Amino acid sequence: HLVDLDLAFGRGTNTEVLSEVVAAVRAESARSSAPIRIQVSGGVRNAESLERALSLNPDRVNVTSAALADSSWLEDTLARYADSDLLALGLDARYISERGWVTVARGTDWSGPAVAEALAWLEGAGVRRYIVTDVSKDGSLAGPGAELLDVVLVQTDRPVVASGGVSSLADLVKLRSMVPYGLEGVVLGKALYVGNFSFEQALEVAGSR
């Protein structure tokens, strides 16, 4: 899971660096008995940023929920890739007391429709998979956004991936309990970087039933 944070926050782009990382991962994957799939995310909200992400030749691209601001482009793009598993929708949201769960764009003041409203539209537009992030949890090691995940899982039968906030193996156990309700996986980041647990330990927890 590779994120162009500069693009996501409107500070430029890390395309060249990501290209080098993708090449290294592809080389490692060629030597591995299990292929390594690459998912690219961060700031993909229009034709230009999607083209930049696709130039990296990833297995999947996450289109940010900020693309809801241009619903015509998003609808056309989802239709173009309707028969492919190439695109996922990165559903970024924040809880606002007056409105409930609302879609947002990181690095901006933009807020879009309520999550329930956005999901109803996205389901009709043909989204095949959601990467769900409570932005107040992302990078915080404060635990996963279970409340937001509950809202999303109730409303869709598409695969859902949790992102942000995981700090411990106990968090993974909690997320694993959501698998019967449609949770497909989890994105790990800071917890691995700071050494809270190893990737091997995470796989052991996630793989047990």
Regions found by a protein language model. Name each.
Residues 1-2, 36-42, 61-63, 87-91, ...:
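Hydrophobic faces of well-ordered beta-strands that scaffold small-molecule active sites
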Residues 73-81, 176-179, 183-188, 192-209:
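C-terminal helical cap(s) of enzyme catalytic domains, especially alpha/beta-barrels
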Residues 36-61, 147-182, 197, 202:
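Catalytic cores of alpha/beta
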Residues 10-39, 76-92, 143-168:
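Alpha-helix-loop-beta-strand connector modules within alpha/beta enzyme cores
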Residues 1-17, 65, 131-141:
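Glycine-rich, proline-tolerant flexible connector loops at the mouths of alpha/beta enzymes
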Residues 54-138:
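Conserved anion-binding
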Residues 18-22, 50, 71-78, 115-120, ...:
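Generic structural signal for well-ordered alpha-helices
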Residues 5, 43-45, 66, 92-96, ...:
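Active-site beta-loop-alpha junctions enriched in small/polar residues
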